[in-house]
A protein has these predicted regions:
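Hydrophobic h-region of N-terminal signal peptides that target proteins for export
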Residues: 13-21
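Extracellular "leader-to-stem" segments immediately downstream of a signal peptide or signal-anchor
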Residues: 2-9, 21-87, 92-156
Length: 156
């Protein structure tokens, strides 16, 4: 006979098992830093070997088409499988704000240029940020992350 306690335990297992396996994607590698003062180890993220090319999500080079949605789709797809590399290929890419998520390595290939739009409304809705040390809602920064971990911006 199944008790309510057994049913609840099974339900928790079903809910939390995918979350635990999702978090396994990124590993941390400690790096010792020589400093003239006591300092804890720095940890580098070792991201899974998965690439998400923004062109597969509709991005077009040339600096004329706004690629904000395509880049966001690539970031979301990468995040949903536990992380990896979102690749910005060689070329000029017009975009609005880029909102990173956990376990994302935003990778710029050699010759890749991000051109951020100069249209203020592209940086809305407002996000929590800081201005002169005060937390406030404001236009989104060019590259933004909030409540994230294991993120990097790398490239050649």
């Amino acid at each position: 006979m199944t008790t309510l306690k057994d049913l609840f335990a099974g339900l928790l297992l079903v809910i939390f098992f995918p979350i635990c396996s999702w978090a396994e994607g990124v590993k941390l590698q400690p790096v010792e830093v020589e400093a003239p003062f006591p300092m804890d180890s720095v940890f580098l993220c070792i991201f899974p070997q998965r690439d998400f090319l923004i062109t597969k999500y509709g991005a077009k080079a040339g600096g004329k088409k706004l690629n904000t949605k395509a880049i966001a789709k690539a970031i979301t797809a990468c995040h949903l499988v536990g992380g990896g590399r979102v690749v910005i290929p060689n070329g000029e890419w017009l975009t609005g704000p880029i909102h990173l998520k956990s376990n994302i390595n935003l990778y710029m290939e050699e010759g890749a240029v991000l051109r951020f739009t100069d249209t203020p409304s592209d940086y809305l809705p407002a996000v929590m940020t800081s201005w002169e040390g005060m937390e406030c809602y404001n236009y989104s920064p060019l590259i933004y992350a909030s409540d994230c971990e294991n993120i990097a911006i790398t490239g050649k």
